[in-house]
């Protein structure tokens, strides 16, 4: 077994069917790779706020970083399907694993796509100041994180990972309000500002995230490795 410990953070909200398939699949998958791991389901509460993926990732990392050496940010609706290529072993460089995903025709979505499944060491995550807390809902926060790593002089490598996509309803940005396109436009603008050096990532991320832990518990009675955080 490798000595480095892996923390898998799953940003989550209202995907119970996906989660029920994801957890047992991933637990078996990582065990077969002989990796010391833990899985953290980081959920934002239905508190009337817009979904903020970056903040709950940052919260999860802050709460569990002392028990790991490297971190994998993993979407709950993607499960690995190729044992040869979906390798979660430790690397000294950032690694993007989800390069061949079913929903994108098992092809790379775009050259700047770092979403789905990405890994890096804890030190790299901290140097990049984690994820931005300013993106609303889904969209562009993963590209922003890739840009952060690159601005820290890290080269992101891709493993030829093949992932199946679990069926799910359309992303729900808010528990009560309909989708607001202006928020996605705001995300795009923020991402371009990051790329162009107009946004200082050192002032937005791990060091500015604010949260309150509502619940912290095991998600499986059969395993100590899988835990759940409910965050406000």
Identify what each model region corresponds to.
Residues 134-137, 143-232:
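C-terminal catalytic/acceptor-binding lobe
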Residues 15-30:
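Short, well-formed alpha-helical segments that are part of the catalytic scaffolds
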Residues 82-106:
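Conserved donor-nucleotide/metal-binding helix-loop-beta segment in metal-dependent transferases, i.e.
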Residues 55-70:
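Active-site nucleotide-sugar/metal-binding loop of Leloir-type enzymes
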């Amino acid at each position: 077994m490798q000595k480095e410990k892996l923390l898998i953070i799953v940003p989550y909200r209202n995907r119970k069917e996906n989660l029920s398939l994801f957890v047992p699949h991933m637990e078996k998958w990582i065990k077969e790779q002989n990796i010391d791991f833990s899985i953290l389901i980081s959920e934002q509460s239905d508190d009337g706020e817009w979904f903020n993926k970056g903040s709950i990732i940052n919260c999860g990392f802050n709460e569990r970083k002392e028990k790991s050496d490297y971190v994998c940010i993993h979407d709950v609706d993607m499960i690995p399907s190729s044992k040869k290529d979906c390798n979660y072993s430790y690397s000294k460089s950032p690694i993007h694993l989800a390069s061949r995903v079913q929903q994108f025709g098992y092809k790379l979505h775009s050259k700047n796509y770092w979403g789905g499944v990405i890994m890096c060491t804890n030190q790299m995550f901290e140097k990049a100041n984690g994820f931005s807390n300013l993106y609303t809902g889904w969209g562009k926060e993963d590209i922003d994180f890739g840009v952060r790593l690159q601005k820290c002089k890290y080269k992101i490598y891709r493993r030829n990972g093949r992932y199946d996509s679990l069926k799910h309803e359309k992303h729900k940005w808010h528990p009560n309000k309909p989708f607001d396109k202006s928020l996605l436009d705001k995300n795009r603008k923020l991402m371009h500002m990051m790329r162009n050096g107009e946004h200082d990532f050192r002032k937005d991320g791990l060091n500015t995230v604010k949260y309150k832990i509502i619940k912290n518990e095991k998600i499986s009675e059969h395993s100590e490795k899988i835990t759940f955080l409910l965050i406000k």
